[in-house]
């Protein structure tokens, strides 16, 4: 029997507010345990929650970015369960009337070497507070509780079960990760837990429209773990069904060392949490004016820019996807193209190639690229006008990078930089290509005279001989001859 995988994701994005969702305590990462837990976070008697306006605004921003409905009123509810790192005995979340309802994510999936577009529908995105953290490693026979994270604002983004493979799930998660950083609502730091995924996975006979029993894999904090966990879980469920067994609805954890999921507990349903409206929080009213105000502050979104890059610049879907994976990359690329609009593909190749490689090697982001877009564009112009070859350009780029300095200053503040840096390096080292036809003809004549055997081999039909002669001409010119011109002159001389 052939099986179809069905996947839905629940993503917890930590919102980039400086204070918590219902208290004034700091959300900064890395403080000593319990140093950033106030009376509200500790659930001391008599304290009351006060809603953080910034968290609501970020939720609205997300809803507008995905074409969702913004609910007004929106209701906060108590989600009741017991766990040591949940001091109140309940979590303030949303059940009925979340802030964001519906919407969709458009993504590009590269699978089996093919590029395809897919739309994943969203069920909702609701606000909630994070729980604390249980610490087991540093204690013998007991656990420690760190409540710094308790009360941190989260936006839980719930998708419909529209994904059919781990590749689609990873593409969705990456697209969502890009979006929340792009619109400035989450820093997306997966190592610090700012962006975590829960995957709901089931399988069913191919062609069936009935959903199978799902298992939820919790707290996947890397795209690689997300892919591996889904692939393992699909294999596990298929093996059970093909052996005549049945799938138990469970919450499972992924063990990255063993590359497998293991049961954590039986999976709860909504009624197990006994949701009811929180009596300490009034229904949230979101005015049309507030929504319009947030809408005006939205930047151009990644999907819109991808479409424009493909249409206006003639880039492939793959290139457009890479260039919109981060807002800083996209803005840097557009600034380079603004200086060299005649060749957006050449600009894309260098931004994704040399510039990305050097930044990655130094652990820097595009925001602090030491070369300004104008400096890079001038170098690319020298390739385009034949002043230097692509090979020499890479050496010039290396020297430009070294001379541009090591300070982490944004290229957006690069007024007064030496825009003639590429030309100075080229001229000071005599790197300009020989493009004079008569000079190149003399070089070709000398090489042909010195290599009669290769000439005879070419005339006998051996194309490798031409490459050898080409190499000899470039060697004689110390790499400074224009390769395209040399190729043309050499072929002409050999066929005379």
Curated annotation (Swiss-Prot):
The record ties this protein, via Pfam families, to: GatB_N (PF02934), GatB_Yqey (PF02637)
InterPro entries membership = Asn/Gln-tRNA_amidoTrfase_suB/E, Asn/Gln-tRNA_Trfase_suB/E_cat, Asn/Gln_amidotransferase, Asn/Gln_tRNA_amidoTrase-B-like, GatB, GatB_C_1, GatB_Yqey_C_2, Gln-tRNA_amidoTrfase_suB_CS
Give the reactions, separated by semicolons, that this protein catalyses: L-glutamyl-tRNA(Gln) + L-glutamine + ATP + H2O = L-glutaminyl-tRNA(Gln) + L-glutamate + ADP + phosphate + H(+); L-aspartyl-tRNA(Asn) + L-glutamine + ATP + H2O = L-asparaginyl-tRNA(Asn) + L-glutamate + ADP + phosphate + 2 H(+)
Which molecular function term from Gene Ontology is one that the record holds?
glutaminyl-tRNA synthase (glutamine-hydrolyzing) activity
Q: Which UniProt keywords apply?
A: ATP-binding, Ligase, Nucleotide-binding, Protein biosynthesis
Question: Its Enzyme Commission number?
Answer: 6.3.5.-
- Which terms does the UniProt entry file under GO BP? glutaminyl-tRNAGln biosynthesis via transamidation; translation
Q: What's the top EC group for this one?
A: ligase
Q: Which PROSITE patterns match?
A: GATB (PS01234)
Quaternary structure annotation from Swiss-Prot or TrEMBL: Heterotrimer of A, B and C subunits.
List the PANTHER family hit by this protein, alphabetically. GLUTAMYL-TRNA GLN AMIDOTRANSFERASE SUBUNIT B MITOCHONDRIAL AND PROKARYOTIC PET112-RELATED, GLUTAMYL-TRNA(GLN) AMIDOTRANSFERASE SUBUNIT B, MITOCHONDRIAL
Q: What does this protein do?
A: Allows the formation of correctly charged Asn-tRNA(Asn) or Gln-tRNA(Gln) through the transamidation of misacylated Asp-tRNA(Asn) or Glu-tRNA(Gln) in organisms which lack either or both of asparaginyl-tRNA or glutaminyl-tRNA synthetases. The reaction takes place in the presence of glutamine and ATP through an activated phospho-Asp-tRNA(Asn) or phospho-Glu-tRNA(Gln).
State the similarity comment: Belongs to the GatB/GatE family. GatB subfamily.
This one is known as Aspartyl/glutamyl-tRNA(Asn/Gln) amidotransferase subunit B
What gene does this protein come from?
gatB
